[in-house]
Amino acid sequence: MTLTFSMPVHSDDELGQLCTAFDTMREELLKSNQELWRQAEERKRLNAAFSHDLRNPITVLKGTIKLLRQGTADEQAIDRLESYTLRIEQYAEAMSSIQRLEQMPVRINEYSYSLLHSELEETAKILAGALEPSVSAPDKGTIQLDHGLVLTVAENLIGNAARFAKSKIEIHLERKGNFLHLSVTDDGPGYPVELIQSGPKPFGKMKEDSAHFGMGLYSSQILCLKHGGTLTLENSKSYGATATASFQINQKP
């Protein structure tokens, strides 16, 4: 059944009001179906990535077990066995974490820009204090959003920038239309081209940090989508990289 049709309303009588109510219900059903479809496609992509990235650890484990059975395994083989077992454990924990994010409800409440500004400053001080990060945000007004969700994304982006920045991080918060934009810029080496072109992947390693599995950026992307927004990554022409998270919002002047 398609829900892309519309019901034009030509009068304000009971029939017109009924048509308006049906059209509102249709729009909500369409939005719900689109979200379910997006989640199903994302789950399919995630499962494929999980299966693909498990192949190498499992192959190494099989080879090491074979050496153990033959009695030819050395201490290095035992270390390798422990290392790859830990990797599989991390993959499993990541899968569980992503599932919890997808099921997390969005709770909208009203907050002041000044509160968000101070919390961003505190987060930046904790995660990137040595880099003397700068934070800019509107001084007045309130905004309606999921406070915890937005701060979680901010923590992920600031923490990621702190790992790669050379000397500074700039954090900027602003409203554009019906969206709140949070951008985090660093002066590090920039994002890999593949990451910018394909977007964050749940288990995508970055060469600069072999312990980083891309979960921070990937989970931020999921949270932005849940809040009706997006996550975009780009490299600066002069230096560094910028991650911009957008969130659909309702704002009071």
For every predicted segment, state its role:
Residues 171, 231-234:
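Short hydrophobic beta-strand elements within the C-terminal catalytic ATPase subdomain
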Residues 179, 190, 237-244:
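Glycine-rich nucleotide-binding loop
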Residues 49, 53-57:
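H-box/DHp (HisKA) helix C-terminal flank immediately following the catalytic phospho-histidine
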Residues 191-204:
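Short conserved segment of the HATPase_c
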Residues 35, 39, 58-164, 171-172, ...:
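DHp/HisKA dimerization helices and adjoining segments of the cytosolic kinase module
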